[in-house]
Amino acid sequence: MILIIYAHPYPHHSHANKRMLEQARTLEGVEIRSLYQLYPDFNIDIAAEQEALSRADLIVWQHPMQWYSIPPLLKLWIDKVLSHGWAYGHGGKALHGKYLLWAVTTGGGESHFEIGAHPGFDVLSQPLQATAIYCGLNWLPPFAMHCTFICDDETLEGQARHYKQRLLEWQEAHHG
């Protein structure tokens, strides 16, 4: 099962993430948990989140890039849900062997994230990648949808279909 942990503080403003979710929903075996819809008060149901994670084979952290990082509720979710003794540390093997895909949207162009004036995605992904490895997750190459503020509908739809294809390819490779 693919579990998408969706963290967008303003989902009604996002054309890119909306299209990505619409494409993902067309696949079988996909569950979407919209953190800002489930927890507008930031009071996370840790047991429910851990139960959802336990059913997943592939976990996707999907969100817009915010100041080269993740939205605050996703950070809190990671801090609370990926707890010692469950996700890491003594006895913390609940996520071992599962896969993690970072699916991120950006307002800037791809060249904005190349080495130079701004850090590249290899650098930006390091905290998430380190978290994944620490919890025994297999880190997959990230999916990034760039230029979401200026893309036309056709481009956004094409990139969303590419996202669906990434998920489908993972399903086929791991579940035949």
UniProtKB/Swiss-Prot annotation:
The keyword Nuclease does not apply. FMN binds at residues 8, 14-17, 65-68, 105-108. Its cofactor is FMN. HAMAP family: K_H_efflux_KefF. It comes from Shigella sonnei (strain Ss046). Its main location: membrane. One of its GO terms (molecular function) is electron transfer activity. GO terms for biological process: positive regulation of potassium ion transmembrane transport; potassium ion transport. It catalyses: a quinone + NADH + H(+) = a quinol + NAD(+); a quinone + NADPH + H(+) = a quinol + NADP(+). This is Glutathione-regulated potassium-efflux system ancillary protein KefF. It holds the Pfam family Flavodoxin_2. Regulatory subunit of a potassium efflux system that confers protection against electrophiles. Required for full activity of KefC. Shows redox enzymatic activity, but this enzymatic activity is not required for activation of KefC. It is a peripheral membrane protein. Its EC number is 1.6.5.2. Signal peptide: none annotated. Gene3D superfamilies: 3.40.50.360.
